[in-house]
Amino acid sequence: MDLEANCKEKLSYFRIKELKDVLTQLGLSKQGKKQELVDRILTLLSDEQAARLLSKKNTVAKEAVAKLVDDTYRKMQVSGASDLASKGQVSSDTSNLKVKGEPEDPFQPEIKVRCVCGNSLETDSMIQCEDPRCHVWQHVGCVILPDKPMDGNPPLPESFYCEICRLTRADPFWVTVAHPLSPVRLTATTIPNDGASTMQSVERTFQITRADKDLLAKPEYDVQAWCMLLNDKVLFRMQWPQYADLQVNGVPVRAINRPGGQLLGVNGRDDGPIITSCIRDGVNRISLSGGDVRIFCFGVRLVKRRTLQQVLNLIPEEGKGETFEDALARVRRCIGGGGGDDNADSDSDIEVVADFFGVNLRCPMSGSRIKVAGRFLPCVHMGCFDLDVFVELNQRSRKWQCPICLKNYSVEHVIVDPYFNRITSKMKHCDEEVTEIEVKPDGSWRVKFKRESERRELGELSQWHAPDGSLCPSAVDIKRKMEMLPVKQEGYSDGPAPLKLGIRKNRNGIWEVSKPNTNGLSSSNRQEKVGYQEKNIIPMSSSATGSGRDGDDASVNQDAIGTFDFVANGMELDSISMNVDSGYNFPDRNQSGEGGNNEVIVLSDSDDENDLVITPGPAYSGCQTDGGLTFPLNPPGIINSYNEDPHSIAGGSSGLGLFNDDDEFDTPLWSFPSETPEAPGFQLFRSDADVSGGLVGLHHHSPLNCSPEINGGYTMAPETSMASVPVVPGSTGRSEANDGLVDNPLAFGRDDPSLQIFLPTKPDASAQSGFKNQADMSNGLRSEDWISLRLGDSASGNHGDPATTNGINSSHQMSTREGSMDTTTETASLLLGMNDSRQDKAKKQRSDNPFSFPRQKRSNNEQDHQTRHRSLNKICIILCAGKN
């Protein structure tokens, strides 16, 4: 096997990287396809003349080339093609090798040398055309020229195109079919001594064959004369010299439309005149002269005209010229600021202040909205133009220049913008006046609108779209898709929340107050823990939270043991929270009646002078129940056992059942009275130590009608009267958290000023010492645990009773005394006194309730505490006055 065949076999295993490494060592060009690189190496082995041409200054022998190929191949075998013969690792010295004397072979046609000077011989410095279909070699000194003759040799450009390739790109509407006259360089004929312009001229002949003449018979074929400045800053355009004089077969032809002495600007373009009418079959003569010192080349070509659609077909389709990801990255970079220059000195106001950026989709060429978004690929901005309009205008102007940045390119750089073209495609059915969109830094967009009517007309286009054109989820959709977390609602109902009182019926049918659970087993204690050390009190406020402010959230103050629901029929119940449920049968039909002998002394400290004093009606006079508090009752006797379901207690839906079992009482249960005694008065608060016979012995002739649902399973005798409801003591020395009538974990102690007005003032030391001498109750309750407020006397007018003087009323006296139920009426009215409505409150209209008193205006200033303290004194006088 000879040397050339051996190297050819080894080169077949080389990759492009290895081939370029070998060519680098040989000093040859590395551009081209793989087969071209292989042929370039094999040429050095087969043809000495071509080797001398390719290697330029260095001459290499066949043996040196073969050794270089062999070393590279051996390294590929050893290292698995990972360590390549590159970066000076080849030890062969190719710089000092000389070509051995061998007979010269004819020049191979693969090595094309075509220069404007007309010389096809190689020189020491040559440059190759970048066009893959051309790859001709030209002399550097002939085509790379300085701007001024005295500037010296300019550096080689990064990319080089020969004059033929530049001409093809200058006007894509003309397709070159043949070159009857190859490019020739104009030469200076005279050099004036007076500094005038140098005259240059060239005269050539070209031949038009019969086949060319047949083509010219078709309307789309023509013969065109062209001229080009070799060192033009705008590569892809024609330019004629100053004072150009063109003649074809002796016929003058106008070459330019500008004045002869005017230079062509950067944005200007010259056209190539059509000389078809001036030529004839056979040999034709053409000459060109001009007064210009610059170097031009001149030629004649046979061309075919392209249609507009054919030129548009040259532009790659959407997504092929540029990927969508690259286009989106450019838009984000431009919207984010900097205009594509990622330098630290970029000072973009858009990046600082704008949430989105307005983009106008009007074509800068036509002024109408862009239909097909086109742009030049090398441009760093995001501006676009209408592709169809742009190409059509360039059919005459031949100015392939970006209308935004004014940089010059060729038709091969035009692409369809994949980002903006999706937007314009969605807007094709919009009105032509809709031309603006808003783009966010992430690339999402929407059509800009100024009025609500425009938004409705745009429809979905007025909403934010993702960069790919899909709709972005709106805030409503996001809210709908949010995960709904389960919320545990304890003691809450959809309607008005009920007031829950810590009372229940014992085995004897007596209503009793829940004692503090010292062992921590009650439901409220399990929820409250041990952070609160003060008592629960009854708020004299319409606030649900005990804060003293009307309209608080009714969802709080719901954690009581049981429910005690009242219906006020539109009247404001100052002594009960807003959490009143109207679903239970506790009507308050406060009707106006004669005042009788009940007289109420009102001391008001409020700012209003028109406080109304409502005289109590005979609610319970004559054993009537219309104005009282009605509890429906079942027949006497305990029919059903008490509901011991702890879940019903904790849930707040067990009616008046307040205790899981009897263990929640610290005192023995009292016996149910066998008959219904008449109550001498109403005991709202009790501090007597003796409650063994019943917590309160106050009854009424009318039945207490409580439904089984409210009683929690207990029933009472029809003749059993309304019993007074004891309230928790006001002592602050106790440490239990739920020692209150109202089992509300949020209203502890005396934190809320609105609660102060319904509590007795704290007794002084002398008053307290009087209570210390009293004996403790036999059932384990201390006398300090109960406080009494006397709300009037019996019908017999017994004001001199010692038990009522100091507010202490024994159970024996209560069980034996006879009287009317006026005090019960007064207490029920006190509990159920509400204003008719919010509108009636504004008009200062009060219900006919015996103990409904004017409320002061609540304010947020520092006088609230003093005002409520004065109101406390007023209430005490009202309650203690009774009936005189």
Curated annotation (Swiss-Prot):
Gene Ontology molecular function terms on file: SUMO binding; SUMO transferase activity; zinc ion binding
**Record domain SAP: where:** 11-45
Q: Where is this region: Disordered?
A: 84-103, 753-778, 792-824, 836-869
Per the UniProt record, which EC number(s) apply here?
2.3.2.-
Zinc fingers classed as SP-RING-type: ranges:
346-429
- One cellular component GO annotation, for this chain's record? nuclear speck
CDD domains in the cross-refs: PHD_Bye1p_SIZ1_like, SP-RING_Siz-like
Q: Where are the zinc fingers (PHD-type)?
A: 112-168
Q: Where is the composition biased (Basic and acidic residues)?
A: 837-847
* Top-level taxonomic group: Eukaryota
Q: Which GO terms describe its biological process?
A: cell division; cellular response to phosphate starvation; defense response; detection of phosphate ion; developmental growth; embryo sac development; heat acclimation; innate immune response-activating signaling pathway
Biological pathway:
Protein modification; protein sumoylation
Supply the InterPro entries for this chain: SAP_dom (IPR003034), SAP_dom_sf (IPR036361), SIZ1/2_SP-RING (IPR031141), Zinc_finger_PHD-type_CS (IPR019786), Znf_FYVE_PHD (IPR011011), Znf_MIZ (IPR004181), Znf_PHD (IPR001965), Znf_RING/FYVE/PHD (IPR013083)
Coiled coil (residue ranges): none
Q: What happens when the gene is disrupted?
A: Dwarf phenotype. Heat-sensitive phenotype. Early flowering under short day. Elevated level of salicylic acid (SA), increased expression of pathogenesis-related (PR) genes and increased resistance to the bacterial pathogen P.syringae. ABA hypersensitivity during seed germination primary root growth. Exaggerated prototypical Pi-starvation responses, including increased root-shoot mass ratio and greater anthocyanin accumulation.
Q: What is known of its domains?
A: The PHD-type zinc finger mediates interaction with SCE1, GTE3 and GTE5 and is required for E3 activity.
How it assembles, according to the record, is: Interacts (via PHD domain) with SCE1, GTE3 and GTE5.
Its annotated function is as follows: E3 SUMO protein ligase involved in regulation processes. Mediates SUMO/ attachment to PHR1, a MYB transcriptional activator controlling the phosphate deficiency responses. Functions as an upstream negative regulator of salicylic acid (SA) accumulation and subsequent SA-mediated systemic acquired resistance (SAR) signaling. Probably not involved in jasmonic acid (JA)-mediated defense response. Participates in abiotic stress-induced sumoylation. Controls heat shock-induced SUMO1 and SUMO2 conjugation and facilitates basal thermotolerance.
Q: What is this protein called?
A: E3 SUMO-protein ligase SIZ1
Whose protein is this, by species?
Arabidopsis thaliana
